[in-house]
Amino acid sequence: VAAVKKLVEEDRVFALVGGLGTANNLGVMDYLVQNNVPHLAPATGSGMMANPVKKNVFQVQINYTIEGILLTQYALDKLGGKKLAVFYQNDVFGQEGLAAINAELKKRGLAEAVAVSYEAADTNFAAQALKLQTSGADTTILFAVPKPGASVIAEMNKIGYQPKVLASSVINDPSIFQLAGPGIEGLITDGWMPPHDDLTDPKI
């Protein structure tokens, strides 16, 4: 918040563009609204950014609630998942995703997903991988940032746990291929914009 206040009050910036992270963006949202500073393309899909609508907040990333519903529908309808688990970051980002997944399951008369959380500061995910394995879930959805998401995939692979794995678009970073190792094979994730360096795409 202090850094954004400096940008607005001392550097007199016209707008804030592409601020990274749910907690960071929510932390400065009210201040930017009160000061009529345009908040463009915040890097978060939290519904709290857009609901209620704010005149100077322009969110482009897919809403985590919508994303959670779509991932659940795909897991059940396309992959034939019978029992779901969710590995999620224990903050607004992960909690919104988990709530959406469970809402879709409830709508279908199904049991809630097995919820396995991690904290943003965690660096070892062996315990979470074991919890996911012992849950008996045949499908796991990740609402995680790249390093923890890729790391838990690697840990699951180490212990021979190979469920169908889907993930929020937040995980989409080239680093996950090295971090996750061979366990990355078969990962399904969504996207809300084409790669900016794909010169074969006429939209780019």
Where are these regions (language model features)?
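Early exported N-terminus immediately downstream of N-terminal targeting peptides
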Residues: 192-194
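Structural recognition of the beta-strand scaffold that forms the well-ordered cores
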Residues: 14-19, 37-43, 58-59, 83-88, ...
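Extracytoplasmic/periplasmic substrate-binding proteins
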Residues: 152-166, 170-187
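Beta-alpha junction/loop-to-helix N-cap segments that form part of ligand/metal-binding clefts
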Residues: 1-48, 118-125, 145-150
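Generic structural marker for isolated residues within well-ordered, non-membrane alpha-helices
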Residues: 4, 72, 173
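Structured helix-beta-strand junction loops
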Residues: 10, 35, 108, 135-136, ...
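Extracellular/periplasmic Venus flytrap/periplasmic-binding protein
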Residues: 46-50, 55-160, 178, 197-203
